[in-house]
Each structure stands twice: as structure tokens, then as C-alpha cells.
Amino acid sequence: MKRSEINAALKEMEQMVQKYRFALPPFCNFTPEEWGKKGHDYDEIRDNMLGWDITDYGLGDFDKVGFSLITIRNGNLNMKDKYTKTYAEKLLYIKEGQYS
């Protein structure tokens, strides 16, 4: 996917989330530069792969096939001594007419 398509998908999902008055965690809006300055206090976010996923499954037609996802919480069975959650919380957004 082109960066412009990813940015448009992010913006569309952000608007939907705002419409329903759901508050995203601050890390969903960090820039790459901000992430570069984040220390070990943010390892849980990195280790558990929290944040955005936008995909068109490599097919090149996001409007027809794909989805947007935000992982807010995620279990990590590989690091269960450090992270005890055994569940995930995710927001999934599929546009009308879009297949996933």
C-alpha cells in the first residue's frame, strides 16, 4: 500500500472512533520521531505489538479488500511471566463494501 492510502485509512478510522466517542490511547498518535525517544517504559507496547495495522493483504486494492485494526491490549504467551494478560482488545474497521 502507498503511504497516502495508509494515512487515509488511519484518518478514516480515527474519525469513526471519534464519532462514537471512544478514546484511543496516546501511543496511537505517536510519530516515528516520538517513538524513537520512548524508553523502556514503553516496552509493553512494543513487546505486545499494540497499535495500528492497515492491510490490503498485498492485493493493491484497499477499498475492495482489506481492513484497519487498532490493538489496544494484547496478551503475550511468549512472555507470560512479564505480561499476564491472556486476552486482547482490538478495534476492527471494515468499510462498507469492503471485504476482509
Where are these regions (language model features)?
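Short, conserved beta-strand element in jelly-roll/cupin
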Residues: 86-87, 91-97
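A short, N-terminal "cap"/entry segment at the start of jelly-roll beta-barrel domains
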Residues: 1-86
